Amino acid sequence: MEPVITRFPPSPTGDLHIGGARTALFNWLFARHFGGRFILRIEDTDLVRSTESSIKAILDAMEWLSLDWDEGPYYQTKRLDVYKDYLQRMVDGGAAYYCDCAPDDLERRRKSAMAEGRKPKYDGRCRDRGLGPGPDRVLRFRCPDSGTTVLNDIIKGPIFFENAELDDLVLQRSDGMPTYNFAVVVDDVTMNITHVIRGDDHVNNTPRQILIYQALGARLPYFAHVPMILGEDRARLSKRHGATSVMAYRDMGILPEALINYLVRLGWSHGDQEIFTRRELIETFSLENVGKSASVFNPEKFLWLNAHYLRERSPEALVPLLQPFLDAKGYPARSPEYVARAIPTLQPRVRTLVEMAEQMRFYLVDEVEYDPEAARKFLVSAMREPFNRLLAELAALDGFSHERLESVFQQIVSELGLKLGKVAQPVRVALTGGTVSPGLFEIIDVLGKDAVLKRLNNALRFIDRQAG
């Protein structure tokens, strides 16, 4: 079997969105599965819309997802001599001709064709005029006016196109730049691409590209067109459905392995398995198991998956990932060891790093702010004696094991004739500022003796002020 070579050719006109990321992932996995090569190519011939910032955003997203490439990135704007050579081959072989039809005249003829019920395609006026290159002239492909072009798609099966329905598409614009359909074929030919895996919005381009391959006498690659991703309303996924760019998900606190796992399952399956390691994905991925119908992006399932990966990561591994989110909130700096001790208390409770950072607040601030309703309900005069007893008992302890803490609390509530909940919830408010948090003994253990005693004393002073 010949070496598998795939490619991912984004246009640098914006961020890398998840549809493009899934395409990159499928190409990457297919190449890695067969021990082949994965090429990154930047399609930047749209000089007006292509930007350096978009190129950087795409490369950053690929690196964040750990989709490494074996060659590239190649830039189409640096390959103009290659396209020029292949354009001349098309002219010399009679497969292309120059056209000087003015844009406004083309538009008038297009509207006339539509008014007469004809397909609004180029009418071939310059086909046999024998024009040479010149100002304001484009180069067009001489499309066969009969016959059928067949796209044998790995995913969709055979698709038939009548050549008479196709257009004499422009291969080279009047400014000398090659068009997408021509440049992509030349790139794939010269880079020996064996498999073209892309979104099914490219299906209608494919017969035109097949005809260009044939005109150049080049071998066709295998084609596989992946169904699109839809929002929950079954419309094509867009910004109105929420975040769609890869880096936006990073900024939401999503882990790259969670995004990889979710994207690959949007359209591909391997039995009933939901969770995959990267090694498992490489071993099991195949185009035969890509579905033919569109996939629906489910935000809740995605967050469930991210929560799974957050729980699977060790606290020590999460610290550097979490730290930028803590810094963004302006929390006081704490040692990595301290943050790592707090993380296990939050891992079962959060779905993103942003949520973890938000819930980490009470561990990091010097003084907690009380939720007004919680303070009104729980930080009351009746808590003076339990808090003072707790201060004395905790100050006398050498360490805060769960067994010791439970013994202290049980002893105090028993002696005061109270139920544990009547004391535990006010203590929770004193230590965290609110009524919802990880387990109380876990919190005390992480905060440590000094912070716990300080917060209990602060709560007593608050109670005194309220009573005064």
From Swiss-Prot:
Sorted alphabetically, the keyword list is: Aminoacyl-tRNA synthetase, ATP-binding, Cytoplasm, Ligase, Metal-binding, Nucleotide-binding, Protein biosynthesis, Zinc
- Motif ('KMSKS' region) positions are 236-240
Supply the source organism's classification.
Bacteria, Pseudomonadati, Thermodesulfobacteriota, Syntrophobacteria, Syntrophobacterales
Q: Which family does it belong to?
A: Belongs to the class-I aminoacyl-tRNA synthetase family. Glutamate--tRNA ligase type 1 subfamily.
EC? 6.1.1.17
What is this protein called in UniProt? Answer: Glutamate--tRNA ligase
Q: What's the subunit arrangement here?
A: Monomer.
Role summary: Catalyzes the attachment of glutamate to tRNA(Glu) in a two-step reaction: glutamate is first activated by ATP to form Glu-AMP and then transferred to the acceptor end of tRNA(Glu).
Please name the source species.
Syntrophobacter fumaroxidans (strain DSM 10017 / MPOB)
Sequence motif: 'HIGH' region, positions: 10-20
What does the record give under GO molecular function? ATP binding; glutamate-tRNA ligase activity; tRNA binding; zinc ion binding
Top EC class of this enzyme: ligase
Q: Which GO terms describe its biological process?
A: glutamyl-tRNA aminoacylation
As recorded in Swiss-Prot or TrEMBL, the protein's gene is named: gltX
GO CC entries: cytosol
Query: Which reaction equations make up its catalytic activity?
Result: tRNA(Glu) + L-glutamate + ATP = L-glutamyl-tRNA(Glu) + AMP + diphosphate
Positions that bind ATP: 239
Co-factor note (free text): Binds 1 zinc ion per subunit.
